[in-house]
């Protein structure tokens, strides 16, 4: 931008000199050095043959080395007009123009006027660009094959100091532009603006931006030069097409968040006001908006929302949707209400219908402090059926119901923590999650740590659900120091074992085979051969398996150790059965593949 400003000043200087040289037949201009607040130029040479007529305009060429303000290196500049004409006083036409420098090249036509009327000094330029290309050394801005029209008008009182009145019109016809972080693959966009500028500020009285296929936004404001920011700003949009707005504007702004791969539809409007460098109000309205994560994590359909906010007054917020899903769990029609008061949001209770139950959230409180969100809430998951949940998740059919109690959850400075245990009732037993913390849960690389305890899970319901065979009994489990990065486990110390107490303990031959497969190559089930053919299930006294995951390797163990390995199932009664494992170090991905095979019924181990 500095180079363009400096170039404009250099051209105006040359044209201004030429415009007063009608008595001269030709001009060759050489300037050793020129300096201004926009930059420097050296070795400037210009050639122009005067005496041209309207019928036979003559060319002009200009060459120089320039260094815009802020740049450290000099670059070459070449400017030419195939036909420069002066059809009337104070008006110049440049047809077939060419401009080439290290960072900018284009063909153009230019009409420039400079006159004084009714005490007003007036300048105007109309530029038609053809196949323009530009870039900057930082790689933050670039354009290719850009075609368009630019109109600029300036005026101010001649005999007294005053701010300049300005007007700008840009019609971008075609070509592609990258303007960090936005990329426009084609043209068809327009911008019109007018206002005043002086030494301290630029006032935008009215500006209108029209984005092809998206909609229109109007703006007014006051930009302070020294502070390099808006002191006052108002933005009002028309009804915008969200399907076109997201890839063009929203996606680049959300690139480093969890919302960087969405598909949207519907329409929305926005009004935003800032006064005296303080946010004063905004109003966001959504009409029948669909939002779907292409990674399959969530979706909301037919969202209608009225979200007002102001610094001075409290407002009611309303949001409703007709359906969607969260991690493939269906969400039913929902209507939510909350209250905003300056930088805080509260809601005594929110109910989100899920499957045939609901997630009831209470004590919701959020605040925007030091440019970050801080919030807390409580929640209860009202009982819903496991068959519906398992079908939604694509799991084997599970019977029964699941419910949960979620204690106070707090989010602050990018960390989510719980004040208490998360309790889940499933498989006729209980699962609790303790010491839960999450870092950057809505970012692109979330991290989770927690401990888990499982108590008295029904092994029969669990093993039948996952086509594992049949194990009758109860199961306890502990997962200590669980660590997930981007929702994938990287570390834990886990143990599952039969629950203490007296109850029937039986295991089917199919389950024996699958457990043997989990033990890896060489795992065996030792059974009294003489009676093997008479039995489909066996008694056991102890069952258990451990896995300590570190560096993608699982160090495995069982209920006890042997000189060669570990015991996974310890037999009891007749027929006696013991399942042994020998591979203590197993790759995590390999173990997952084994689990996948045994739960799909595609394995058979040696039983002897």
Each model region followed by its residue ranges:
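N-terminal secretory signal peptides that target proteins for export/translocation
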Residues: 1-4
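Bacterial N-terminal signal peptides
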Residues: 9-18
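Extended amphipathic, helix-rich lipid-handling scaffolds
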Residues: 21-216, 222-294, 303-413, 417-419, ...
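Short edge-strand/loop segments of extracellular domains
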Residues: 426-429, 497-503
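Histidine- and/or cysteine-centered catalytic micro-motif in compact active-site loops
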Residues: 453-457, 495-501
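C-terminal structural cap/anchor segments
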Residues: 480-484, 490-498
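Outer-membrane beta-barrel and related beta-rich outer-membrane complex signature
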Residues: 504-513
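C-terminal structured domain segments
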Residues: 536-578
